[in-house]
């Protein structure tokens, strides 16, 4: 009888533990994106670079363009991690669409650079999001 009770109890505990672990992972990934955005908000010098970058401002010098590129790669790598974890994630969709909709510089960056640094499946995902706009 005790074995039967354990056999019934254990799977439900494992499901709960898996669900808690999945939620914790998702929360950690999304908080990483929020923290990364916080850099843009708290660093006035970078905010200027970011705002000019998303508008495709050609006056960005080499160092500024590099900083914008690194920010974009890092941001989209975090979205790719969310997508890798759950490719049906509403969070991945939300954060990708937020950035893709901010300005022509983001789309230029993605077409010229971004699509060449990410996994093929994620590139297809982002390409589909861009086509939907």
Report residues per predicted region.
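Amphipathic alpha-helical "stem/stalk" segments
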Residues: 12-133
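Alpha-helical transmembrane segments of integral membrane proteins
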Residues: 2-9
